[in-house]
Amino acid sequence: MDILSISWAFLMVVFTFSLSLVVWGRSGL
């Protein structure tokens, strides 16, 4: 595994996590 795929995987995880936080915040949970 090279650094590019590691950084891409990390970016996707952070993006998904922040997106779910926004959705949960707007849902009132």
Swiss-Prot record:
Annotated family: Belongs to the PetN family.
Keyword Electron transport tagged: yes
Function, as annotated: Component of the cytochrome b6-f complex, which mediates electron transfer between photosystem II (PSII) and photosystem I (PSI), cyclic electron flow around PSI, and state transitions.
GO cellular component: chloroplast thylakoid membrane; cytochrome b6f complex
TM helices/strands, residue ranges: 3-23
Organism the protein comes from: Chara vulgaris
A GO molecular-function annotation: electron transporter, transferring electrons within cytochrome b6/f complex of photosystem II activity
Self-association state and partner proteins as the record states: The 4 large subunits of the cytochrome b6-f complex are cytochrome b6, subunit IV (17 kDa polypeptide, PetD), cytochrome f and the Rieske protein, while the 4 small subunits are PetG, PetL, PetM and PetN. The complex functions as a dimer.
Protein name: Cytochrome b6-f complex subunit 8
Pfam families: PetN (PF03742)
Keyword entries, A-Z: Chloroplast, Electron transport, Membrane, Photosynthesis, Plastid, Thylakoid, Transmembrane, Transmembrane helix, Transport
Membrane topology classification: Single-pass membrane protein
SUPFAM superfamilies for this protein: PetN subunit of the cytochrome b6f complex
Annotated GO biological process: cytochrome complex assembly; photosynthesis
Subcellular location: Plastid, Chloroplast thylakoid membrane
